[in-house]
Curated annotation (Swiss-Prot):
This is Hps1-dma1 cluster cytochrome P450 monooxygenase cyp3.1. The gene is cyp3.1. It comes from Dothistroma septosporum (strain NZE10 / CBS 128990). Heme binds at residue 260. Pathway: Secondary metabolite biosynthesis. Residues 183-205 are annotated as: Disordered. Belongs to the cytochrome P450 family. SUPFAM superfamilies: Cytochrome P450 (SSF48264).
Amino acid sequence: MGTYYRRKDQFLLAKIHEAEARMTGEDSSGSSARIRRRSALDHFVRQEMDAAARAGRAPDFLHGPIRDELLGYIIAGHDSSTSALSWALKYLTTDARVQHALRQHLHAVHAASWREGRTPSVAEITSIRAPYLDAVIQEVFRCAYTTPFTLREATRDTQIMGHFVPKGTTVWFSTSGPSFTRPAIETDRKTSSHSRSPTALADKQRVPAWSPQDVALFRPERWLRPDPGPSDPPDFAYSHVDFNGNAGPMMAFGSGPRGCCGKRLVYLSMRILVTLVLWDFDLLPCPTRLSSDESNHGTASHPKQCYLRLATTTHGP
């Protein structure tokens, strides 16, 4: 294992040195406003430079936190994005109703592209209001638990469902199961109310529980407010419906100040990729022997089988 750790450290340190050279060059040239920071690492290095200047010390670019954050970005950023896209394609293949509704929605919100027989541009995809697309992406993250768990450290002695947890304990939270993809476990509300902080209680009220009747189903409409329901004629643009990311519990990216800071990039990537795939292709059902719902768990959850049968679609009315 020592060899692998050394290789890992050598790789990370090389990337840190590259970012350091970019940022120190930025200062010496006096063109900080014109040079674009290329990555999260550039921002980490810039923040360390600013913190060192305020403290009157030399920057320390090689200290542990920067290395640890960079490793987390490399592992989690790559695996979570590929996992999310794999599950999105799998869910849309399995659920023809959602796939058809989403394609109709994309044609409606990108009406000019549809009339002109062309693919929407990235600028159009990332800026257009598309509540049903956002709901589908959110439902993928809820159901797929691309990141199987998240960690927090207890800052004081506490209790979790009757179990004593001493200060300093690392607590592992599952991002699936009860409350997320299965009915919630009933707890003693009186005891829970006394042990929770006012902010925690307020958050619990702000994000309601899912209905136990359909919590296990892949149903993107749960993220829309008000519920779109049937309309005649159908409003595929969902003009009078809003996407609500707090419609119910979902922990794919953690929360609070230690939540995933790459969350917006993942959503942006999913918006682009899902739109482009459904714009050009029908996702046809695969044989049962190639359609297992089982997953492989690691730093992210990936489907064991993710096969596609594609048919090209026509553009324009």
